[in-house]
């Protein structure tokens, strides 16, 4: 039928023959009685659900309209469907007179006015027109009919009307209606045809549009509808009459001036529906089908028009109200009132009629909108109940049957309503109101019926039913998911997932369902919200999103037979590209008449159906990834701008007010004890905060893991649940509450845990049972319910404990049922045994009912239970085994398939033979689908009851709307592993191009999401998998799949380089293998190209800055698929594939990959370089044994260095930290080819890099040239060292002007080269240094490399064996002085000069000479350096301030003499060559000492502050064991004092005298008095005894060993050295004091201190000489040959003392003799002289007794000098000590031993006294 024919149904010609002639097929009908019974059930509500509520009482109301009212109001309380079982049928026989109707459903006058206004606005030409012409004609034909003549009343009524029509043009509708009604009560086909046609035309002209005066009466139109409907009498009704009935009813329902509602509307729809089903003519069926569609559209279009009108009207009123400042709240119900008036079952029980409710209800309850809403509700409910009619198994595939056509028609109408009028259903403000309950949205009122309709039909194996049911589900999922949150979970988990996973479901079902999943995957919003509302919500909710992806991945991974490459699908064979399998479009309802519907009977299986299903699954996965990435790139409004109103519309499923305002904090945190607290707060997650949802997901995962642990080890699982706060506390109550309310627990494990015999488990079990309720439940049902909570363990003691507690609980809940708990216990135990006996396959002789009764005799406290009760129990157990639902046989409890009932053994054999031609898969699915449907229906009932009990809105009912892209990250992390497995399978096993392309597309899309969120673990897994499938390690097995994988890998790498991170290693390793394949294809021997991925040499570790551990990668198992697949390709094709790897496209892609590194970010280029370094090192390591090692990646490193050289310094420094380290390592490689290549590449790169200007104080060049330095220091190959120097030389010559910080590295390299003992390398280094010294010194100075230059030249100046070059280096330094002066002058001009800066230049310069002086091997070089140094100091003495001179003296001068600070033994240990050290000390050091002292001596006025340092240095020299050094030191000391005696100040003299004191103390042999060095000697022994025994061996034996003796011998030698130094020092002082005017320059007070110093040495010598015991010990020790003495020191000290004292006294002559100072000094000197005279006299007397000859010879000059000094005193001085001197002279004479000189002196003295 064409669209034009459908649109003109309401205008069918009045001649029924015209329509009759268009009939297409006329079938043989069933018997009339059968059809009537079937039709009467089509809309009968009593058969909707086969159960009836036990709690609701039936309400007897005769009025059919009130029954419809009750149907609506009963649904407002959201009762489950079983509570509506007693409602009256919307289909009833219209018997009796219409006047007896007590209640009217006509519209109120005000509503009629509104509707007329609306109708007039839409149709200005509508209204009452004069129908005289066709009425007269109709009545004329009626009067001529034969039937009219047989009915007197009818004939009279017709005649009356004809007469009245002749009198007046217009008659009242009641007048015309009466004969028409009478005509319809006849059985005349002619009369019925004419009458119905007349009705239709009158309705078109709105003739019956007359409101009744009494609102309780029915309208004329309603009477007309009843009359028209009564004309249909089943299939026996003539087809012409049926067509006219359809036309008339359609005109009535679609009338724009009147509204047919409630039972009258349903009556019209019912009769049209019956005609559609029962009519034999296919054309009439088609017309009836279109009429039904237009009736439905009329109802909802009228409702839509009224809703739009009222919204506009309310908007105007709101604007007026807001302008007046007073909002209109009259129509807003008070919440407290609404809660009080909530409709309940009890209110129905006490309600007498709806009249009182109507009278008390507000006026708005009777509004037109509410009336139309009730019509819509009743219509949808009726269609839903029609769709769930059960169809016998054998008739399910007969699509032409009336029951199947009825089901399909109802489903299509439901789909049409949902699709077309979704705006009405999805509007939460469209609410059905009731005076006794809160307003209920229309969608909530019809939701339960739609769900039940889907549950019954979506499991159907009849494909048209299944597909239209899936389409309805899709509309709900896409548009109404916020209203069906809990219901959608049931559909997914109980129906759709099982269908996809079942083997018995057909491929057609799977492809239809995959189409729905594909649409779901294409909508990002739907996917995200599925994840938020199911996967992230804790509790028992299924992970819908995750399971959907896992299921799709599993289907995609299934093995199928792929079509051969030559196979091409026709359009009708490729079903995956079509929107539906049966219905290619659902924009219009398909023709369901009996002639056309047969085309759906034979479902076809297109070729390679499994393959197409697999393709569809891949498309679903790809759509999922595409949707996720699309969602990532969307822009969302800021969450903070969401208002409370937004939350109301976007965060809740039922339009309720949010439970908390935004200012209030959530009631519970994520980590609280129970997650229900968080979800029960409607506002807690209203804004879908990603972090909170991530925590929720984590929390749910924790719960699932804990449950899994419980199912494995229950006690450990309980511990985890407690620690994670899923169980509030350790109390048995809390644990039992969790166990009984949590799904997913293994019931067998739970039974074992609860049955444990310890006290804790028993307490938990008791609490577990106490949480159950058995109130008013039969005993067997209670026991069955009890045993559904867990699996009863097999141990008898455990069973006993369970039964005891059950009996106790049952008796508590049902007092009086049994006499005591023992009865319940015994009976329960008996039933358990009976259940086992009747249903265990091991039991052969089963218990009979009499046996069971006998076993239970006297169990009720001695009394018997009734036999009927026990028989009922037995039969119940026999029919229905007590078994866990999860373990129940899926074939049980379902309608038996015909021919499969329990038969005998022989009959079963016959049936087995009979199944040969049966569809066993279909039968298995039929049983499984029935189970799914029943279970789903039960879940919906429980769900609705639960919602009613806990309130309309709870935490789990809140529907969260996605607003954040951050949700995508955890979504992908939850499913990436099955997705990866699915996409890997075709690449691994398939050769089908479509599958491979889909897989690679999946990889691309997955990587988009991965890179967007920078997920490490998935990235590594996907990239490693993709690189693995390039299969480049085996060129003989390459396939086109591998080529495509490589191209995809390159595309991903080019597009997402910044995000690859560690995966760059896999990509670059693959490119390295690609280069190997290209070389092989070019003819290179494969043996000379080792594969990096397969060769595993002994790896050398990279530097830790380069190498990082890579964790989290997933290694995929190697499969033999490549080997098996390779057998299908010929050798020629393999060669062709290998050549393709060298194609221009691949080569350009690889080149672009490296050239595009300049576009990578800072982190991206860092990761790229790091990975390329690792690959390069692996290439090198795997090809060490080859003559030409692989250097591909090393070359690429140089390339990318060129590309990225111009990056900002921060990025380049990061890159070079890797490159520099790697080039440093490679340049020292043991393979010279590799090292040379690295250095040469680095040289070329350096030439480019040095072109870039470097600013001051940066060190990029220094770091860049560091690999050269490392190669010079660490390479063992002299050729590499020579290459380094040549590279440096070339860089200097070409880029010296641009070198800044690089000079430091260059000079460091050259300095190190000076240590190499190779002539060629040394000559090259010398050449470079010479060139620098003569050509580029000024450039180096300006570039800040001055110190490094000096250090370099200094090291070359110290070379051994090349005197000429070393002298030239000293000259370079000398010339550098002039350049330095110029540079400093330039700095002064540039205003960057400072004194400190100048000194920073001078000090390194001076220190370089110090280094040469101390370390140069050639004496002439050292001497020249020494001369240049001191010449420079003389020239610039005035330029240096005192502080800098201090620095110079300490670091550049005094450090030369640092060797003097160590002992001889240390010197011998430290010096490499003792002889050279001695020579250096006697030559260079002595020369340096003289130069230093000479410097201070000549510049003393400028350098007087260095006097203490100079004296300290001289002290060290004088105290050396080397006599030459000591003498030089004494000479320098003497000359220094003499030279500057006139410039010394008092403080200087203090330093000098202190120095003299220090020298005398240091050279004083105090060790002579250490008794531990010598053996004990008897004090009574004479000198002769000592001499006699001094060399006896046995006297020496007291020493412990010869080594001890040698040690003491050496110690004595040091004592002798001290004695010698003491004499030298005294002689030096003697000569110094005898110099001209020496003593006169020393202050007299200082001389007193000097005398005390001299006397200390004198007294020590005198004391030693007087100690015979010590001297004897020394002699007896054998370490000396003669008796030791210190006569020379004693005599010289005495002589020097007297000379000094008398000279000081003599110098006082010129002073004033009267001054006090003079007298004090004279007294001091005289006293000292007198005491000293006594000391010398005592010594003279001692030597006369000990050794007269030698002693007298030593003391006589001293005595003579003393007497001579006395004689030299002037008279005043002589007279002051005259008496003391006289006594001294007398004592001398008394001693005797007076020689001529002494005698002469004494004579002169006495003569002076005589005078």
From Swiss-Prot:
Modified-residue entries (Phosphothreonine), positions: 326, 742
GO molecular function terms attached to this record: guanyl-nucleotide exchange factor activity; metal ion binding
SMART domains: Sec7
Result of knocking out the encoding gene: Causes high production of ROS, significantly decreases proteasomal activity and sensitizes cells to tunicamycin-induced ER stress, resulting in increased apoptosis.
GO process terms (BP): endoplasmic reticulum to Golgi vesicle-mediated transport; intracellular protein transport; regulation of ARF protein signal transduction
Positions where Phosphoserine occurs in the chain: 40, 332, 353, 741
Compartments reported by the entry: Cytoplasm; Golgi apparatus; Golgi apparatus, trans-Golgi network; Cytoplasmic vesicle, COPI-coated vesicle membrane
Region named Disordered: 1-108, 316-336, 643-688
One Pfam family from the record: Sec7
Positions occupied by motif HUS box: 533-537
GO CC list: COPI-coated vesicle membrane; ER to Golgi transport vesicle membrane; Golgi apparatus
Residues in SEC7 domain copies: 692-880
Ranges for region HDS1 domain: 889-1103
Binding site for Mg(2+): 812
Domain of life: Eukaryota
UniProt feature, compositional bias: Basic and acidic residues: 33-49, 57-73, 80-91, 643-663
Polar residues composition bias: residue spans: 92-108, 316-326, 669-688
Database matches in Gene3D superfamilies: 1.10.220.20, Arf Nucleotide-binding Site Opener,domain 2
InterPro entries per UniProt: ARM-type_fold (IPR016024), DCB_dom (IPR032629), Mon2/Sec7/BIG1-like_HDS (IPR015403), Mon2/Sec7/BIG1-like_HUS (IPR032691), Sec7/BIG1-like_C (IPR046455), Sec7_C_sf (IPR023394), Sec7_dom (IPR000904), Sec7_dom_sf (IPR035999)
Keywords for the protein's UniProt record, in alphabetical order: Cytoplasm, Cytoplasmic vesicle, Golgi apparatus, Magnesium, Membrane, Metal-binding, Phosphoprotein, Protein transport, Transport
Main localization (coarse): cytoplasm
Free-text note regarding domains: The homology upstream of Sec7 (HUS) box is necessary for the allosteric activation of Ssec71. The homology downstream of Sec7 (HDS) domain 1 is required for recruitment to the trans-Golgi network via its interaction with activated arf11.
Function of the molecule: Guanine exchange factor that acts as an activator of arf1 at the trans-Golgi net-work and is thus involved in vesicular budding and traffic between compartments of the Golgi apparatus. Activation of Arf (ADP-ribosylation factor) GTPases is essential for vesicle formation via recruitment of cargo adapters and coat proteins necessary for Golgi trafficking. Involved in tunicamycin-induced ER stress response and subsequent apoptosis.
The protein's name: ADP-ribosylation factor guanine nucleotide-exchange factor sec71
Biological source species: Schizosaccharomyces pombe (strain 972 / ATCC 24843)
Taxonomic lineage from the root: Eukaryota, Fungi, Dikarya, Ascomycota, Taphrinomycotina
Gene: sec71
